[in-house]
């Protein structure tokens, strides 16, 4: 367990350590927020960041993007994150879920996620994509059984929400025979890359990832029925140990405002009810 925690922290340090070279802080009084977010949100969050920083020049938003499961493990291991945005709002239940050690301890533990969180941030849809020149033409989930589809990329269900939703769809439709075709990936962007390069015959990604792929790189074969998996809801949550809670709350409020909502809808995300 200790080894896993050390590994998670080291991965976090490597991921975040390079940020200072990308965007150095110019003034000592400049404040910063460190956000760990699902990689499927990278494009939209960077646009929201630009809008926020233009209105708040004294603030710098720094991102640590990755698979939601990996980010969750970093947070549970003590990574100094201010804000977490997961592709599966259910991940927040795991963050404060007692492990074996804490469950046997009489000393109460401090909640990692602040009171009142998580909150819904956005929604998405699951689709199946194939390489642009693919001659295989699956039009529905049951077509994935065809012999022409030998390798199907999917995010690792243990750590990648998109893979978890796809796994739920496989189980709900009793398509267990598909498992021998599955190629597990670290995150949904890796699934997309594998399909673009033709290393697999198809893969499950979010509709927004398929939409943002360069024109002609992939082809969307079909949308997975939302009845086959849990609702795809991205969740946002401030950490109790955030260095500047008020500033984090200000950024969360901004992301729920009209500018960021417009960015989300333009990218194909679904909006939560306000």
Question: Model-derived features: where do they sit?
Answer:
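Short acidic/histidine-rich motifs immediately flanking catalytic phosphotransfer sites
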Residues: 79-81
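Positively charged n-region of N-terminal signal peptides that target proteins for export
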Residues: 1-5
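Bacterial N-terminal signal peptides
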Residues: 8-20
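Exported/periplasmic ABC-transporter solute-binding proteins
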Residues: 20-56, 60-65, 69-77, 86-89, ...
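Sequence-pattern detector for short linear motifs
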Residues: 7-8, 210
């Amino acid at each position: 367990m200790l080894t896993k925690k050390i590994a998670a922290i080291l991965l976090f340090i490597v991921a975040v350590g390079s940020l200072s070279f990308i965007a150095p802080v110019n003034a000592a009084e400049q404040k910063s927020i460190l956000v760990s977010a699902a990689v499927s949100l990278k494009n939209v969050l960077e646009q929201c960041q630009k809008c926020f920083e233009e209105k708040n020049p004294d603030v710098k938003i720094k991102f640590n993007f990755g698979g939601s499961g990996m980010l969750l493990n970093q947070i549970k291991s003590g990574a100094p994150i201010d804000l977490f945005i997961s592709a599966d709002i259910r991940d927040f239940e795991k963050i404060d879920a007692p492990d074996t050690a804490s469950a046997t301890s009489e000393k109460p533990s401090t909640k990692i996620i602040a009171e009142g969180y998580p909150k819904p941030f956005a929604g998405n849809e699951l689709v199946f994509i194939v390489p642009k020149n693919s001659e295989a033409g699956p039009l529905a989930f049951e077509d994935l059984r065809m012999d022409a589809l030998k390798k199907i990329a999917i995010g690792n269900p243990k750590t990648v929400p998109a893979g978890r939703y796809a796994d739920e769809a496989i189980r709900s439709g009793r398509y267990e025979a598909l498992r021998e075709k599955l190629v597990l990936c670290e995150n949904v962007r890796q699934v997309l890359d594998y399909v673009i390069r033709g290393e697999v015959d198809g893969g499950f990604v979010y509709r927004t990832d398929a939409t943002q792929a360069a024109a002609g790189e992939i082809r969307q074969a079909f949308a997975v029925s939302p009845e086959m998996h849990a609702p795809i809801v991205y969740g946002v949550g401030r950490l109790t140990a955030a260095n500047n809670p008020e500033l984090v709350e200000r950024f969360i409020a901004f992301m729920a405002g009209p500018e960021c909502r417009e960015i989300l809808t333009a990218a194909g995300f679904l909006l939560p009810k306000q």
